Each structure stands twice: as C-alpha cells, then as structure tokens.
C-alpha cells in the first residue's frame, strides 16, 4: 500500500512500461516514445507516449524536458512545460525540438523522452474592473528590478 494519490491511467500501447519515478522522491515520472523518429537540427516532432490519464479537478499535468537529454543531445520540448488539463482524456503527446545546431537526434521507440509532473492548481474566475490596486512596483515590467535609483 502507498500513501501517494492514485491517478487513473490507460495504457494505449501495452508494450511500453507505465510511467514511473527513477527514485521515490522524484517529482516527475518518465514518459516513453511510441515511435522511432529522427529530429533534424532546429526541427520538431510530435511523439506519442502511449498513455492517457484522468487527472482530478484542481490538478494539472506538466510535461517537462528530461535534463540529461537536454544537456547531452539538445532535446527539449517546444512548449515546455506542456500542459495536460484535468478534463483531457486523449493520449499524452510531446512536441519535441532538436536545439542542437548540427546533429540530428534519434528517438527510438521506448526511449524516455519527457517527464510528467502532476501539480495542484488554483482554479479561479476573473472579475473585470476599471483599474487595479496600486502597488510599489506598479506597471514596471521587463528589466525593471535590475535598475538602481
């Protein structure tokens, strides 16, 4: 028996392993590629993971790049982190990109291509107003915190 919350999962590709953590305290579980792919430098490819999940309302799945692949190969995720909404029930797919300027990246079926992190999320409604409360920062945006008086 485990004290971790259970997420319902459908294995769409029975030959691939279920997502799992490498270590008990890891935030993310590994996602595996359903197909082989060659991603040319600067190009992207949408790759299936062979799973669909049912997230509880008030949670979100975030698909992150794997740090080792990013560092060694230049493999990343175009929209990192990818967002899996609680009401989505289709296959989780990952839009991979090759950031290496010269070398293609080979993806082999079964490779661990991304990590899925499940988080609680605050669901809110928006209230339209004419103006916002004043703050010390105000409307100072990009680069404003690096300025000195």
UniProtKB/Swiss-Prot annotation:
Q: Which UniProt keywords apply?
A: Hydrolase, Magnesium, Metal-binding, Nucleotide metabolism
GO-annotated biological processes: dUMP biosynthetic process; dUTP catabolic process
**Cofactor(s) annotated in UniProt:** Mg(2+)
| Top-rank taxon | Bacteria
Binding of substrate occurs at: 66-68, 79, 83-85, 93
Write down the EC number: 3.6.1.23
Q: In which pathway does it act?
A: Pyrimidine metabolism; dUMP biosynthesis; dUMP from dCTP (dUTP route): step 2/2
Q: Does the keyword Magnesium apply?
A: yes
Q: Which SUPFAM superfamilies match?
A: dUTPase-like (SSF51283)
- Which reactions is this enzyme annotated as catalysing? dUTP + H2O = dUMP + diphosphate + H(+)
Keyword field contains Kinase: no
Q: Which InterPro entries match?
A: dUTPase, dUTPase-like, dUTPase-like_sf, dUTPase_trimeric
Family label: Belongs to the dUTPase family.
**PANTHER family with a match to the protein in the record:** DEOXYURIDINE 5'-TRIPHOSPHATE NUCLEOTIDOHYDROLASE
Q: What does this protein do?
A: This enzyme is involved in nucleotide metabolism: it produces dUMP, the immediate precursor of thymidine nucleotides and it decreases the intracellular concentration of dUTP so that uracil cannot be incorporated into DNA.
Name by which UniProt lists this protein = Deoxyuridine 5'-triphosphate nucleotidohydrolase
The gene for this chain is dut
């Amino acid at each position: 028996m485990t004290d971790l919350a259970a997420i319902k999962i459908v294995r769409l590709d029975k030959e691939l392993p279920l997502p799992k953590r490498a270590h008990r305290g890891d935030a993310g579980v590994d996602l595996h590629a359903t197909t082989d792919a060659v991603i040319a430098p600067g190009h992207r490819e949408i790759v299936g993971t062979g799973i669909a999940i049912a997230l509880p309302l008030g949670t979100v799945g975030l698909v992150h790049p794997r740090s080792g692949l990013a560092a060694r190969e230049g493999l990343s995720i175009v929209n990192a982190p990818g967002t899996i909404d609680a009401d989505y029930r289709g296959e989780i797919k990952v839009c991979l990109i090759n950031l290496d300027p010269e070398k293609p990246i080979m993806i082999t079926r079964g490779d661990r291509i991304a990590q899925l992190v499940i988080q609680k999320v605050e669901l809110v409604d928006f209230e339209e107003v004419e103006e916002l409360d004043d703050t010390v920062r105000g409307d100072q945006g990009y680069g404003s915190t690096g300025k000195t008086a």
